[in-house]
Amino acid sequence: MHTTTKRRKAMDWLNFDPIPEVDRLFRFTCKHPTLHVHMTGSYGHMFVDISDLPASARHYLALMAASRHRCLSLMDHHRRKFLEKGGQQMWLLGIDWSYMKFRKLDYLNRMLCHRPWMIHWKNLAVLFARRTPDGGPAFFSVCSLHHAVGIMSMTHAMCTVICCIGLERRVDLTQDEIDFLNIDDLDYWEARMSAYFRKVPDRRPTEVEYLISELKKTEKGQTRPPAKMCAMTTETIESLISAPAATYSSNRKNYSPVLLLANIDENGEDIMEKEPPCNYPIYSHHRTFGYIDFRKRPEKDIPPFRVEEFGWDHVYNTMNEYTDTLTSRLDRMFDHIRTLTGNMPSGSSHASGDGEPPAAVNQNEIDTAAFREAIWNYTQGLYGVRVDDYDYSKINRVLDKGTKTFIKLAACYPHKLTTEFTRALPGFKDSEKIHVVMMVAMARFQASMFHYTRAVCNYNAMCLSKKGWRKPLD
């Protein structure tokens, strides 16, 4: 009887209204025609390309990925597409209603979105197919897993774009949606469910709260004190919810498949008991799990990712064998977005145009290569990707503190941005602002693919090492 009541209540989520914001997204990218072609081609190709993944499963994966950043617009869009492609309605009740392989993939979804440097080859070993060509209900084929990771990483990046340019739905919200958006806000839950949470007196602001307050000061033109950002340490995470967040072994010794069953953390504890009682459908477990500054990571045995040792060419060659068309599209998109603009007005200190030389070159125009390179390398540095031959001191000379704050929020906490923060880049034109946002989104996308593909190579090497052929990279 209890199960029937729960199922009837959850079925209300099937009666949603499609939100048109996603269709409006590519109208903004039209300000850069060539980029628009690459974006629409790459994003659309992920859902129509020939692959082992059924069409409905692709949209369900995107729904799982969008839920990590609580992007309601994308979630509504992929719910509708999932049903249009013949997906099972019961799956929309939550990830626990889907196949086992999607529940196991949820762990990888969390890592790709928030801490990709933690992806290990043993996380992939329990996902690959054993006997059936398509992987069956419990495993993925190599091709389908590559495709699934591409969809999830691209969706994470699209959440950044949608939230930054103000297309995220923040009106006509139900109470459950409001609870979902504030799942990690201790003050909100203290006021709403005081009986379930203890009050934390005089707690220090979390890193997200600090970044948002700094961004507000930038918009108001206030002078910011030279305060040091508080790191998202374990103590800070504990201030978000009543119980401490799940910990992850710095020795990386425990990679049991049970960790991939979503509702159990590495310590064998029930994640659901640590989260607020939110009734919104769960498409990805451990919803309070989030980004931690790479420099403050507890996993000190994980070194920075060196591009000189494993660059985009390695990623391309590894995945091109299985997803050649998709990989080629991504290669062209990454190459184009990094060279999108050639010049910018010196008065505004940012880029303009679509890579085409202006009719009359102004003597005050300067090259934007340093600006674009600083944005790209700073964003990827947030996810542990380092370029040895780049002078990172240039970032502080090229990007002011307000711009770096906006980039960090956009890349790591896009769900914390609202429409009022779209004015965080004063003096930027719409096309220029979109260019910056797209660079941030694609830089984090590529960083996720770096870490994932290196784990794939380590997995392949370990399989061969059993025959004495080679050793893993790590």
Curated annotation (Swiss-Prot):
It is found in: Nucleus; Cytoplasm. Disruption phenotype: RNAi-mediated knockdown results in decreased lifespan. It comes from the Eukaryota. InterPro entries: AhpD-like (IPR029032), Sestrin (IPR006730). Keywords: Cytoplasm, Nucleus. GO terms for cellular component: cytoplasm; nucleus. GO terms for biological process: cellular response to L-leucine; cellular response to leucine starvation; negative regulation of TORC1 signaling; positive regulation of macroautophagy; regulation of response to reactive oxygen species. One of its GO terms (molecular function) is oxidoreductase activity, acting on peroxide as acceptor. Belongs to the sestrin family. May function as a negative feedback regulator of TOR function. This is Sestrin homolog. It comes from Caenorhabditis elegans. The gene is sesn-1.
